Amino acid sequence: MSSFAFRLQKVFEYRELEEGWAKDNFLTKHIARMEAENELFDLDDNRKFLLSAGADDLQARRELELRIQKLDDNERALRLLIHQLEMEEEQARDEWILKKQDKGVLEKLRDKAYDAWMYRQNKLEQAALDEWSIQQRKTA
C-alpha cells in the first residue's frame, strides 16, 4: 500500500503558518488594548486618590488642579489610543478569521483527497484479495 501524498501539502502548511501569524498579530493587538485600558483604570484610580486627598492651602489647590488637568489630558489621549487599538484589533481579528477560513478550505480538500485515496487503496486491496481467492480455488 502506497502512502498518501496531498498535492497541495506545502500550500496547506504555508496557510497554517499564515493563520498562526494572523492569530499572533490579533493577540498582540488585543494585549496592547487591554494594557491601555488598564492604564486608563490606573489613571482613574489616581484621580480618585488625588480628589479624596484634597488640598489645604491655595498653592496645594493649584497644584492639585494642575495634576487633575494633566490626568484629564492623559485620559483623553488614552481614550483616543484605545479607540485606535480597538480598530486595529478588529482588523487583525478579521484578517485572522479570513486566514483561518483559507486554511479550512485546504483542510477540506486534503480530507476529500485522503478519502478518495483510501477508496482507491481499498479497491486495490479487494481486487488483490479476490485474485488471491481465485488462485486458491484453482489450486484446490
Language model features with spans:
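Charge-rich amphipathic alpha-helical interaction elements
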Residues: 1-140
